[in-house]
Structure formats: structure tokens, C-alpha cells
A protein has these predicted regions:
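CheY-like receiver
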Residues: 121-141
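Conserved acidic carboxylate
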Residues: 12
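The feature encodes the CheY-like receiver
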Residues: 60
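Acidic catalytic/metal-coordinating carboxylates
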Residues: 37, 63-66
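Acidic, metal-coordinating helix/loop segments flanking the phosphotransfer/catalytic sites
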Residues: 34-52
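Two-component/phosphorelay signaling modules centered on CheY-like receiver
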Residues: 15-33
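Active-site residues of response regulator receiver
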Residues: 56
Length: 141
């Protein structure tokens, strides 16, 4: 999928992080919808045509893995990337997400992971699963 046509929903409760991520992704050709909380994020997810979600792990009221689980029940075809300021998360926290990055990783990692997620949407299930497995095994190393 072309970046210029991809709409990314970013959910982050820290305004500075949300604004920085939005500006960075827009600079690289993405359309970005931003939400500073869970309710706002879920409303945008349901009402807009979203190609991928970039979701903070630690949100007030509910962790990102639980939000991702709700989103997957609503639309399992939208890839979700979970970001965390904390190191690797246990595998059970990653069940409903398609990619995991720590916030300390360089922004270029976000770009390449996002493009991989968008490209993987059209791949057969096994190819998507293999990419996810490779990514998760690198995170836990």
C-alpha cells in the first residue's frame, strides 16, 4: 500500500509524543488521525477508514493490549502496532497486536515496521504470521 494513501490512527495519552509522532508520520506521507485517549481512539477506529493503528501500551484506564484486543474483535483486518516505554512485554500482552516497538527505538524503525504492516495486509496468513514471529523473537532476545 502506498504511504500517501495510508491512514494511521495514533493513540497516545502524552500530548508531546502524540504530536511528534503525528508530525513525523505526516512528513513521510501518511495521513494521521490522533487520539489522546481510549474512548476517542475507539470512536475514530469505528467511524473512519483506518489502515493501521499505532497504540501506546500504558494508557489511563486500560492498557494498550486490552484496547488492541477490543479493536481486533471489531475489525481483525486492521494491523495494530503497540509502543511501550518499557522493555519487552510478556508474550500474552502481544497476542492481539501485529507488531511491537519500544519508544526508545529510532523513528526509522517505526517507519519500516509500519510499511511492513501495511504490506503484510495483503499477504497470506502464514507469511504474516512468520513476519510477526520473527519480530517478536527479536524483541525478546
Amino acid at each position: 500500500m502506498s504511504r500517501a494513501k495510508a491512514t494511521i490512527l495514533c493513540i497516545e495519552d502524552h500530548w508531546n509524543g502524540l504530536l511528534a509522532r503525528k508530525m513525523f508520520l505526516e512528513k513521510h506521507g501518511y495521513e494521521v488521525l490522533e487520539a489522546s485517549g481510549i474512548d476517542e481512539g475507539l470512536k475514530l477506529f469505528l467511524s473512519r477508514n483506518v489502515d493501521a493503528v499505532v497504540l501506546d501500551y500504558q494508557l489511563p484506564g486500560m492498557n494498550g493490549d486490552v484496547v488492541a484486543e477490543k479493536m481486533k474483535r471489531l475489525n481483525s483486518h486492521v494491523p495494530i502496532m503497540l509502543l511501550s516505554a518499557y522493555g519487552p512485554l510478556p508474550g500474552r500482552k502481544l497476542r492481539s497486536v501485529d507488531w511491537f516497538l519500544t519508544k526508545s527505538q529510532p523513528p526509522t524503525d517505526l517507519l519500516s515496521a509500519l510499511q511492513d504492516l501495511l504490506d503484510d495486509q495483503h499477504k497470506p496468513f502464514f507469511a504474516r504470521w512468520l513476519n510477526q514471529w520473527k519480530n517478536r523473537s527479536q524483541v525478546s532476545s
